[in-house]
Regions:
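Active-site region of glycoside hydrolase catalytic domains
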Residues: 270-408, 417-437, 462-465
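Short, surface-exposed alpha-helix to beta-strand junction/turn motifs within ectodomains of secreted
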Residues: 60-93, 119-122
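Acidic/histidine-rich helix-loop elements
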Residues: 163-187, 215-220, 264, 380-411
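C-terminal motif of bacterial Sec signal peptides marking the signal peptidase cleavage site
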Residues: 18-21
């Protein structure tokens, strides 16, 4: 029995010893192993757009993209941003997935643009991408143009709109505006003589015809037609060119309805043809100082931001159809109208739509069709004074917050350059039928106004566009 007790005590002591040796005691727990730290590699550049060393890149706003080998983040530090030489950074850079994107402005030909992505701008958690630089070169300066389109630009030169007069509209057939002409003025021969002496080459005579028509066959009031003709005669006597158009007749030219209803479209086309036949017959013996313009600013009331963006191009096709009808109608009257220059607008007379594929020039055996555009960019500066929520400054010296971003000098150059490349270089004249800027409320703001007007004029001249002040 004594031996048995000794054995039991010995066994218990051994078990305790084993337990302690195996770390089973709560006073001395085994530490948790630390997993190895994974290696974080910095993002590296796979490609750029434009590619490094690329040449013949179009001038203007250049979209740049830098693609990395993994999803990346961008620093919030405002001092870190792409560094550009040979151009300027427009707006802010952004990242999406593996791509860093931003816009570079460069309006100069044959210019090397170098882009540097500084270290610290791009990275992932735990690692920053190294600094990266690449460059590309803009296209060569095109040969100086010398064709019918540039010759016509010189002939039209700088002009003035006889606006707020014959374009006055009541919005009703047979009902002249109850307030009379909006300009409350009576043109005389002296007006046109003085315009010529001031350096004006062209007068755009804007006319609304529908207020002086009552019903089918849409005969234009004879006295009204005579008054319009008198002004054209005065301009001719002064040695001016004249662009005569159909202006605020949009109230019966409902392009949204016409684009979706063939009966309405046929009725509108019938009236367009009958109206333009009368105009063309009245002036068919006039010389080549006279130009016709099919329409003013045909649009659905939303100035290019309406149903035209979602209707599958129906409104654009309808306007193309109307422009073709006007050209055919004028040519059919014979006389000097067989070869008279005719201006046609794109949707809303917008350069944007004139540069898109939805705008199709009319076919013309005489090959004498011009493109008419209007330029009021940015309208927050040109059409809206600062006391009515507009911007007070414009251009590269404008103060932060006082100008419309994306619409400074680079935008003017890019727009006019594209018009020249698409049309003038292909012997199709382009004229800016309207441009201008409202008076602003401070001397400083009006200095920017003056700079804007001068810049637009100089740019138009550079790119062979004639222009007519509103």
């Amino acid at each position: 029995m004594k031996f048995k007790n000794i054995f039991s005590i010995t066994a218990i002591m051994a078990m305790l010893t084993i337990n302690v040796a195996c770390g089973g005691g709560s006073d001395d727990p085994e530490p948790t192993p630390t997993p190895p730290t994974p290696t974080v590699t910095a993002p590296t550049v796979l490609s750029t757009t434009p590619a490094n060393g690329a040449t013949d890149i179009a001038t203007g706003s250049i979209s740049v993209q830098v693609s990395y080998d993994k999803d990346v983040n961008m620093s919030n530090d405002p001092s870190l941003k792409p560094v550009i030489s040979g151009g300027t950074l427009s707006g802010s850079a952004s990242v999406s997935g593996k791509n860093l994107s931003f816009t570079v402005n460069c309006s100069d030909y044959e210019t090397k643009v170098t882009v540097k992505i500084p270290k610290g701008l791009i990275g992932v958690t735990g690692a920053l991408a190294d600094e990266y630089s690449f460059s590309f070169t803009t296209k060569k300066k095109p040969e100086a143009l010398n064709n019918d389109a540039t010759a016509l630009a010189k002939k039209l030169g700088w002009g003035w709109n006889l606006g707020n007069h014959f374009d006055t509209s009541s919005g009703q057939d047979g009902v002249p505006n109850q307030w009379g002409y909006w300009d409350n003025a009576t043109p005389t021969q002296a007006l046109y003589t003085n315009l010529k002496a001031a350096g004006v080459s062209t007068v755009r005579v804007c006319v609304t015809w529908g207020n002086y028509q009552t019903a089918d066959p849409w005969t234009i009031d004879a006295n009204y037609m005579a008054e319009v003709k008198q002004n054209v005669d005065w301009a001719e006597a002064a040695g001016l060119n004249v662009i005569l158009n159909m202006h605020h007749d949009e109230y019966w030219q409902d392009i949204k309805q016409a684009a979706s209803n063939n009966i309405i479209n046929e009725n509108v086309k019938d009236r367009i043809a009958k109206t333009w036949t009368q105009i063309a017959e009245t002036f068919k013996d006039k010389g080549d100082f006279l130009f016709f313009e099919s329409f003013n600013e045909v649009q659905d009331g939303n100035w290019g931001w309406g149903d035209n963006l979602t209707d599958g191009g129906k409104q654009y096709k309808t306007l193309n159809e109307w422009n073709q009808l006007v050209v055919n109608t004028i040519r059919a009257t014979g006389g000097n109208n067989a070869t008279r220059w005719i201006g046609v607008p794109a949707y809303a007379s917008s350069p944007k739509f004139a540069l898109e594929d939805g705008f199709v020039l009319p076919t013309d055996a005489a090959n004498r069709v011009m493109v008419s555009v209007h330029f009021y960019d940015p309208n927050t500066f040109t059409l809206t004074p600062e006391d009515n929520g507009g911007k007070s400054e414009w251009g590269h010296t404008a103060a932060s917050g006082k100008y419309q971003t994306g619409s400074n000098e680079e935008h003017v150059v890019e727009t006019f350059q594209k018009l020249q490349e698409k049309y003038v270089a292909n012997n199709i004249p382009v004229y800016i039928g309207e441009y201008g800027c409202v008076m602003h409320t401070t001397d400083r703001a009006n200095l920017f106004r003056n700079y804007y007007l001068e810049y637009v004029c100089r740019a138009a001249h550079t790119y062979n566009l004639s222009l007519i002040h509103i």
